[in-house]
Amino acid sequence: MHLSMGGLLPGLALLASANALALALPLESSVYTVQVTNPFHESLFSCPAASWPKVKLGSENRSQEPSKDLKKILSQISPKRIEATIRKLVSFGTRHTLSTQTNATYGIGAARDWIESEFQRYANASDGRLTVAVVGYDQQPDGRRIPFPVRISDVVATLKGEGDPERVYLVSGHYDSRNSDALDYKGIAPGANDDASGVAVSLELARVMSQRGLPRPKATIVFAAVAGEEQGLYGATFLAQSYRNSSANIEGMFTNDIIGSSTADDGTREPHVVRLFAQGIPPLNVEDQAMRERRIMIGGDNDTPARQLARFVKETAENKHTDMEVSVIYRLDRYLRGGDHRPFLEAGYPAARFTEPNENFAHQHQDIRIDKDPKTGMDIQYGDLPEFCDFDYISRVGKVNAAALWNLAMSPGMPRNVRVNTSDLTNDSKFTWDPPAGGNALVGGYEIVWRSTNAPFWTHKMDVGMVQEATIDLSKDNVIFGIRARGKNGERGVAVLPFP
């Protein structure tokens, strides 16, 4: 199929809307606080960098509006339920991985059993759509944060897809906690933000998405609560390797870790922003040195599977219905920190991490106490307590997750073997691809998307129909291309970078 230039592409207008900022100087403090007062600003999918090359081809790539079913899902995510979940998890005293697993009211075993019972309660009301399992293994001493053998258990709820059930998307939070001493498994460690907040989102999404009044998703969605994160990402590593060993087709994984507060240690509030960390070049065990060199040669280091997944989230989950801005961070994680998305990346799966915009380290990995602030000398409350959580904010982060997961699960999977022809010196670009792993049953057509090489998100698109090759009059030297499938229901999937 050959597509020549034709049709006028409307000029991309840079949206001028910006957050209204209210600056206030509290009388009792000399610290300026910046508060975002505009709850929503429209998504930016164009930028000055995207103005060249100028082409009269295709159309503007716009954000994807939520479907009727997705709007229903978003409307039912409850801050009160999220708060109740977090307070219940805190009530177990500590959820340290090494803590007791036999006490019915204290320790990680009690938390595990309660999480399982909640998932099972939702499963019982789902008419068989949701199934629940506790999976795990016995971890031996590691010479670091596991001094004696301990059982690592993950609680997993699976919403089986209908249409392409072998394609899987997974969302997780970790239910273990810690205080100042990573090996203190007896002391109180409430872990409200880190990471009861993430577990609360997994539970709430399972509740809402599995209800009888909704259609089944096309692909399978897994909701997980994992253990062992604070001791070395053990639960997530076990889960990722279990899926890899069974050759599972996981096309996207999100972990929600520290999503509980929108307020920084200096009082700065950004209640309508969430960070999404997305890795660049994959690990060498996923892409070998030769593949890595090819990626670098074509300028594809910013178009890894994880970053394509993040672009999809930006395009589908940043809107007035979620009331959130998704700030994509082109980095694996924060400095000196790690998260449960990493084992999935190392297993070869696209994965990314949601985290609040500004962290207060007095409320993470701390013994509960009142102590001096090293900056101000004033007494402050230390500890990861529920009183420092913003439950409305957590529910909005949950909506971002829901929008991304539902759109992913209702759209076709990623095209495979996506190639760009470089056999001749030409000023056009020829592409070939194979259908998604699940075949063409859900596919209504394919789209070529592109952006300027220094633009962060897709700015243009062209529908090329139900084909597996296409040539367009736009030089591959000047832009970054992607190929994505469009569903018969109109839902667009994740784009894939073409390799020579």
Curated annotation (Swiss-Prot):
- Give the record's cofactor note, including how many are bound: Binds 2 Zn(2+) ions per subunit.
In this protein, which residues make up the domain named Fibronectin type-III?
414-500
CC cofactor: Zn(2+)
What Pfam families does the database record attribute to this sequence? Peptidase_M28
Could you say which residues bind Zn(2+) 2 here? Answer: 194, 230
Query: What top-level branch of life does the organism fall under?
Result: Eukaryota
What EC number(s) are associated with this protein in UniProt? 3.4.-.-
Where do glycans attach?
61, 103, 124, 245, 421, 427
Q: Give the signal sequence positions.
A: 1-24
TM region(s), chain numbering: none
Q: Which keywords accompany this UniProt record?
A: Glycoprotein, Hydrolase, Metal-binding, Metalloprotease, Protease, Secreted, Signal, Zinc
Q: What GO CC terms are in its UniProt record?
A: extracellular region
Where, per UniProt, does this protein localize? Secreted
Q: Name one GO molecular function term.
A: metal ion binding
Q: Which GO terms describe its biological process?
A: proteolysis
Binding-site positions, Zn(2+) 1:
174, 194, 257
Name the protein family.
Belongs to the peptidase M28 family. M28B subfamily.
| Protein name according to UniProt | Probable zinc metalloprotease MGYG_02393
Q: What is the lineage of its organism?
A: Eukaryota, Fungi, Dikarya, Ascomycota, Pezizomycotina
